[in-house]
Amino acid sequence: MKNSSPKNARKTRLSRDVRLNIATNCALGLLIFSIGVVCLFPVNGSEAVDAGGESNVYRCAPTETDGVSLMFNVYWGTEEVYRILDILDEHDAKATFFLGGSWADDNVACVKEILSRGHELGNHGYFHKDHAALSEEENLQEISVCNQFIRLMTGAEITLFAPPSGSYGKAALEACAALNMKTILWSRDTIDWRDKDASLVYTRATKDIKGGEFVLMHPMEATADALGDILTYYEIHSLRAVTVSENLQNGG
């Protein structure tokens, strides 16, 4: 009996994604159009929305917990996402994946796989824009389109927004408040997208780590290479890899 090769597996995933994308393109087009119309009007009529300032921005859990949250910002690296999911399963670990809408549009099967494995989905904007430079209405549209596309594909309600590059301003906070969403940043950054070095990723994700921290990662080969050792380190030090929402709830 012949075993399926990685190349054949990639072809199968690509074919599956293509079929799903064809089935959803029309629905997405209507969604984007309708949200664009809605976002031309202020939220709640003429009433101002209280963004709550920095009180609605989280870089870690409010108090120390026994959990560490790995947050993967995803605009590329589909094959590494599958590797990461398998490694997380091996350690009974959970994570939060902040999805770029344009990536999710091309990788519907992968998005559904993330959710089916018990992980949390978050919003990373649709087109990876600088949210500090957008108006409130532009922020609303960029965030809402991503939210509603993910909901259309998976049924998941998205409550967390991680701005690309951590860039946000008052308008972004007001948009998140209007959408009843929390803005999520990080307490430590592996900078895996730049250095592409598994040993550096490991050190940055483990050195002096405390419960309640949010660790920023991306679906890079070096990150996947280091992930198993990172999770083992957490286990040895009585830390659990949990979703951002679980960490916030336990540390509240």
Where are the language model's segments positioned?
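Loop/helix-junction capping segments adjacent to catalytic residues or to phosphate/diphosphate-binding pockets
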Residues: 78-79, 104-105, 133, 170, ...
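Basic- and aromatic-lined ligand-binding clefts that recognize polyanionic substrates
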Residues: 152-168, 173-176, 222
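His/Asp/Glu-enriched short active-site or ligand-binding loop at hydrolase and phosphoryl-transfer sites
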Residues: 173-208, 239-251
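Active-site beta->alpha N-cap acidic-glycine motif
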Residues: 46-134, 138, 142-145, 149, ...
